[in-house]
Amino acid sequence: MFYSLSVKNFILIDELEIEFNKGLCVITGETGAGKSILLDAILFCLGYKTSNNVIKHGKDYTVVNIIFSLNDEIKKFLIQNFIEPEELLLVKCLQKVEGRKNFFINNQIVTKTLMKQLANYLFELHGQNNNITLLEASTQRDILDSYGNLLEFRVQLAKCYQIWQNTRKEIEEITVKQNEIEQEIDYLSFVTEELTKLNIQIGEEETLTNIRKDLQNKGKNLQLIRDIIAEINNPEINISINRACKLLARQDYNDRFNAVVTSLEEAYNNLEVARQELSNILGSFTYEEYNLEETEERLFLIKAISRKYNVPANELGIFLDKSLEQLGILKNKIANSNKLQAQEVLLQEQYYKLASDLSAKRLIAAKHLEESLNQELKQLKMENANFKIEVKTRIDPTASGNDDIVFKASTNPGMKIEAINKIASGGELSRFMLALKTSLFDKMIKPSIIFDEIDVGIAGEAADKIGDRLKKLSSVTQVIVITHQPQVAGKADLHIKIEKTQLEQETKVKVKALNLAERQTELARMISGKTITAASLKVAKELLHPVAFSHDQK
């Protein structure tokens, strides 16, 4: 509920602060006194469209602060939007002459959209030009379902509808994309078969690259050994050594060349040893586990596959796993198609059974609400009004059921019953809403309800009845009423008066919460005009008698 309102430099207001009470709060004042300014300030603060020129003449900014009490629903909204709930809720709007509006919730800057979303949890507004929600089909449906205690049943229906629609969507996706799915299955089957067959291991490319490098080095060494052996095996070397030894043996000084002969013979023997050792080394190369050709073929294959699927060689195993997973999903989609179709039939039957039950309950609730509302309208002195609720089957099912709900009425005898937006004036719509709220009473009630001049065009007993209904409604929620009727104002728990004053070429608006004596004077003014008479004071006192009595008992 509204706890307090603080306004500064707003239109004709210099500065004011109002504290509100629970129950029924009325706002009165002479015609043109600026009663609507308070309402404009509230709408301005909560992000609704107001006049473009709201900053008081001569000032460079305006600011409006409203403090609300909290309930669990509001706390949940704040938490969902990352705003820390406090003991009370503070909302603020600041606008400078040269700038745009800035909105704050608990001193945290927010968007206008978020502020308006919050406002939906805080209050309702009904008046000459503010009954749009009553005209919306969704609101009319919610009113009927709330009256008939059908909201929980509707939640059950909505869950069934959602599952049904999700199943239908899945079937449609499979049907529309059947060829694509089958092509994808063929492709993934080929991919997974190829990669599984290749069995490429993590790190294999790097391992093979190192092996190839090693083999290439060994290949160079092998060729070198072969070249050396070829040189050693040259027969001319042996022939040359033998010939040298024979020549030395013929010399007269044979003894002097014995050492040379010995060296040549050792050279011959060493060549034989070297030849044998090199042959042994050469033979050992034939027992390597890998050969270069096989290694290069495997490396070429891995690189080709990597390029083919545009996947790093080291991630081909992951790519295979994902391909296998996707292949399984697509195969299951095809396999489950028939199951889904059977399931969709059952869900459709379940939905229409629930929707049919809801329609039947709505028809019963509609009849009872019609009777209740028509009685309330009579109490509000709309004896000629006739209210009807049309519940008709719609072509397309929805999460809210298979019905279109239309509130219809006629306000005068002989008039055709039509949708209420076509036949009712702003004031009549407000009284329709008051009658609905009274019929619903403790259902669909927000923390605060504002009625702006709901009693325009009525007086006497009708105004008294409206006051009674507003008073009754205020027992379950805070009700704020801008009124011209003393019968309504006399029932208030809090009476606020707005006055417009002219001082030195400047117009100002003054707001004051009245005490009991001041209320009597204000009611007398509302009864007789500017000239307050003894008779009007007496009537005012009688209107206030229940209030005065309740104050005396406190």
Swiss-Prot record:
CDD domains: ABC_RecN (cd03241). GO terms for cellular component: bacterial nucleoid. One of its GO terms (biological process) is SOS response. InterPro entries: DNA_recomb/repair_RecN (IPR004604), P-loop_NTPase (IPR027417), RecF/RecN/SMC_N (IPR003395). Keywords: ATP-binding, DNA damage, DNA repair, Nucleotide-binding. Pfam families: SMC_N (PF02463). GO terms for molecular function: ATP binding. It comes from the Bacteria. ATP binds at residues 29-36. Belongs to the RecN family. May be involved in recombinational repair of damaged DNA. This is DNA repair protein RecN. The lineage of its organism: Bacteria, Pseudomonadati, Pseudomonadota, Alphaproteobacteria, Rickettsiales.
